[in-house]
Amino acid sequence: MGSRPFTKNPAPMMLTIRVALVLSCICPANSIDGRPFAAAGIVVTGDKAVNIYTSSQTGSIIVKLLPNLPKDKEACAKAPLDAYNRTLTTLLTPLGDSIRRIQESVTTSGGGRQGRLIGAIIGGVALGVATAAQITAAAALIQAKQNAANILRLKESIAATNEAVHEVTDGLSQLAVAVGKMQQFVNDQFNKTAQELDCIKIAQQVGVELNLYLTELTTVFGPQITSPALNKLTIQALYNLAGGNMDYLLTKLGIGNNQLSSLIGSGLITGNPILYDSQTQLLGIQVTLPSVGNLNNMRATYLETLSVSTTRGFASALVPKVVTQVGSVIEELDTSYCIETDLDLYCTRIVTFPMSPGIYSCLSGNTSACMYSKTEGALTTPYMTIKGSVIANCKMTTCRCVNPPGIISQNYGEAVSLIDKQSCNVLSLGGITLRLSGEFDVTYQKNISIQDSQVIITGNLDISTELGNVNNSISNALNKLEESNRKLDKVNVKLTSTSALITYIVLTIISLVFGILSLILACYLMYKQKAQQKTLLWLGNNTLDQMRATTKM
């Protein structure tokens, strides 16, 4: 991952650094515990320390390409030295010419604005076809012009020294170290040995070593044929030029051994050629080093997801790739401003994003809050190794245990299978055989199931299918609406006016009142009729009794 350009406004960056430092001082850093959600297909792959850097330090290396031999041995090595000198001049003259063209293109006439404008135009012509990065390198080369001139002023004394490492400070605005890889070889082979060597052996040894160094020079400057002065030299190239003497400059600039290996892997230590003098065979390189600030209490945690098995098919968890935790706060970390090494992140700024409550709860160990996206691709990751063990989706791939032999089955509803040496010593996954040495302890949650409500649609094809279903539902609703409109069109609008409705309501109420009164009257008449019938019946019975009594008498 490449680094982003440095910000033009330092204020936001300083504010970010201060906020990060304050946060790092308040709470101790906690690494996210991946054991609760490993069985849910979310795996913590590692942590890295987070650092802030700016490319603010510079120093110069003056590479002495032509060694000084002892006086009594100069004649023996004259032939290989002359051939080496000619080859050096042929190889590096385009580099020196390119440097001079760019540096001389900024000469001004009279020091006014017009002169600077003309110089800028000539500089653009001198660059030819250049990328933005090469234009930036050209600007740095122009800024180093005075320092290169000061080095050239001391070139005779630098070329005359027999020291392999020599610090140059006279009249220079920055630290400069003269190093000679070939001079180191001469000193080790001839100046510090009491063994007498014949002339032929001296010539052979010098010739072989010079040829090897020429090969290294060709390797270093081979990619710079098109724009020899504008391409950066990597730290590996600088070590090829200076040998072990490169460490002297780095130590002087404050790079400790504990940072050196990480910074070398980051690619932040680079160099740009600023001069080449064919007369003395001196090559000047300006080295740029980062100024690093360590955020001791901030770490970046990397997450990877597996394809898990659900009742709706295979799915992968929706979580950030990188998160950072300070205290109890977990946020997504944007690494686009960072350069990664094996153990560190070097960032020009710290940019984090808050996460939704669901993802926060998921990464805190609540797997029921994790959301998943359907994944049906053939390249979806079905398994992953972690600390000598394996987390695998044995429904997506065949988990064959070689020792002891058997097929590892995954229970219905189980998201993934956690396989360690307790269950299988040698495991075969899709033709890949792994010997397991780790073990999942009791802190790892197992037999986690993913509910249907946790699986959402995010793939383009799935979304298209769902949209098609929605469109069909909308079409059906529109058809029903049109049918309803047709029925409403048949209704007489005049009968549905407000006055008509009021009349209908009043008439309905009157009808109800009359109906109720009629019902009451009918009930009264029926009651009265029954009463009359009872009276007549009583009178009839009474008369009959009197007649019976008279007859008996």
From Swiss-Prot:
Disulfide bonds join 76-199, 338-347, 362-370, 394-399, 401-424. GO terms for biological process: fusion of virus membrane with host plasma membrane; symbiont entry into host cell. The inactive precursor F0 is glycosylated and proteolytically cleaved into F1 and F2 to be functionally active. The cleavage is mediated by cellular proteases during the transport and maturation of the polypeptide. Residues 1-31 form the signal peptide. GO terms for cellular component: host cell plasma membrane; membrane; viral envelope; virion membrane. Residues 31-500 are extracellular. Residues 463-499 form a coiled coil. Keywords: Coiled coil, Disulfide bond, Fusion of virus membrane with host cell membrane, Fusion of virus membrane with host membrane, Glycoprotein, Host cell membrane, Host membrane, Lipoprotein, Membrane, Palmitate, Signal, Transmembrane, Transmembrane helix, Viral envelope protein, Viral penetration into host cytoplasm, Virion, Virus entry into host cell. This is Fusion glycoprotein F0. It comes from Newcastle disease virus (strain Chicken/United States/B1/48).
